[in-house]
Structures are given as structure tokens and as C-alpha cells.
């Protein structure tokens, strides 16, 4: 059963970029398509490494010999939204890491599972109207053996992360339920689950149609 963290925000205060460790606030001057000079405010990470990508999220499929395919989601308190969130495991990419290396490391740390990266997305924008932060989505597979115990997490100091294994066929419904209970669902996880659910509900929209003359 999912339970909300007892953590809570005690105050918000303004923070100059010069005093911030992880994020900076900048003003952008630019010229729009009509030649008009404009400005924009942007929040940027200070930690981007050589790969040019800030973070990685680990979409994961868990295969078990006698159970349906599932995925592991993590619940943790996120101060910016003042709530417990439901997310796929994710983390920042270290300075000299590749996204795939970070994905394997972070999945192991947050869930205890050893996974294999199957595919990696291009660097995609996290919230392009507010920040230049970007990320890669690494889809991963974890293959379990019958009777294999749940592994121990390897969390960093200060991390309080609850992992939950959810059957893929139930993911969208479970996310909807958690949202009604007051959990905040991470957009990337919700979008993936909603897309999968849409395909399940409307398979006729995704049937390939042979084009006239194809293969001729």
C-alpha cells in the first residue's frame, strides 16, 4: 500500500543564483520571428556534465517466470511540489557518465535491481517553457528468477524512497487512483502510461495499412 511521506516544507525563501548549489536563474534576451526584441526567464542546472544531458529516467519492465510483466515506480517527497510523488526511478548524470551508465547505477541504487538498458531516447526537454533542463529516457529490462528475494536498496544519505512493483496492465489505473489520493504523478510516467492505455483501448488506430504499390 502506498503511504505518503511524513516530510514537510517549513518555509520558502528567495535564493540568489550566486548562493544556489544546483540551479541558477537567468534572463534571456532574444529576437522573435517578427524581429521584436524580447526577454525570457530561465532556470538552469549548474551540474550538466560532458554528455550534455542533465538526468536520466529509467522506464523499466520487470519479467518474472510466473507473474505478469510489471514496472517499478518510486514514491518520494519532493519539496518543490510539497507532496509525495509517484515516478519512475531517475537521477542526475555524473560528470563523466553516459546516460546508460547512469541508468544502470541509479536503478540499482533506488530499487536494488540490476537492469539492462534496451533503448535510450535522445535528450528531450523537461519543461521547455521554464528551464533548459533535459533528460534521456532509458528503457530497461530486469529478468527475475522464481523465488528470488526482493533486493536491498542502496540509497544515498538523505534519500527516502519507497519502491512499488505495479503490473503493467494496472499501471494507468493505479496512477489515476494515487492522484485521487493526493499523490503527485510525474509527467513522464503518466504520459507513458496514458499512451500505453490509449493503445490498449484503441488498437484499431495503430494498425498499419499497406500502401498501394508497396513492394512493387
Q: Which positions does each model-derived feature cover?
A:
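Nudix hydrolase/Nudix homology domain
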Residues: 2-6, 81-84, 95, 128-131, ...
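Conserved Nudix-box catalytic region and its N-terminal flanking loop in Nudix hydrolases
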Residues: 10-13, 52-59, 66-105, 122, ...
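Acidic, metal-coordinating catalytic segment for phosphate/diphosphate chemistry
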Residues: 17-59
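Short, solvent-exposed loop/turn elements at beta->coil junctions and helix N-caps
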Residues: 13-16, 45-46, 122-127
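Short, well-ordered beta-strand micro-motif
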Residues: 27-29, 60, 139-141, 165
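Active-site-adjacent beta-strand/loop module that shapes the phosphate/pyrophosphate-binding cleft
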Residues: 31-34, 128-149
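A short coil-to-beta-strand element that immediately follows conserved catalytic motifs
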Residues: 114-121
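Short amphipathic beta-strand and strand-loop transition segments with alternating hydrophobic
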Residues: 6-18
Amino acid at each position: 500500500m502506498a503511504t505518503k511521506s511524513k516530510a514537510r516544507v517549513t518555509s520558502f525563501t528567495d535564493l540568489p543564483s550566486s548562493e544556489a548549489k544546483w540551479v541558477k536563474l537567468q534572463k534571456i534576451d532574444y529576437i522573435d520571428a517578427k524581429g521584436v526584441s524580447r526577454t525570457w526567464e530561465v532556470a538552469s542546472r549548474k551540474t550538466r556534465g560532458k554528455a550534455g544531458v542533465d538526468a536520466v529516467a529509467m522506464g523499466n519492465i520487470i519479467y518474472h517466470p510466473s507473474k505478469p510483466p510489471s514496472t517499478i515506480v518510486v514514491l518520494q517527497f519532493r519539496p518543490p511540489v510539497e507532496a509525495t510523488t509517484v515516478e519512475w526511478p531517475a537521477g542526475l548524470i555524473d560528470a563523466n557518465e553516459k546516460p546508460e551508465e547512469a541508468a544502470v547505477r541509479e536503478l540499482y541504487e533506488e530499487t536494488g535491481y540490476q537492469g539492462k538498458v534496451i533503448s535510450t531516447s535522445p535528450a528531450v526537454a523537461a519543461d521547455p517553457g521554464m528551464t533548459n533542463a533535459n533528460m534521456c529516457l532509458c528503457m530497461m529490462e530486469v529478468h527475475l528468477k522464481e523465488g528470488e528475494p526482493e533486493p536491498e536498496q542502496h540509497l544515498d544519505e538523505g534519500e527516502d524512497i519507497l519502491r512499488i512493483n505495479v503490473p503493467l496492465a494496472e499501471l494507468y489505473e493505479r496512477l489515476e487512483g494515487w492522484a485521487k489520493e493526493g499523490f503527485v504523478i510525474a509527467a513522464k510516467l503518466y504520459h507513458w502510461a496514458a499512451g500505453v492505455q490509449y493503445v490498449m483501448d484503441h488498437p484499431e488506430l495503430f494498425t498499419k495499412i499497406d500502401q498501394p504499390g508497396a513492394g512493387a
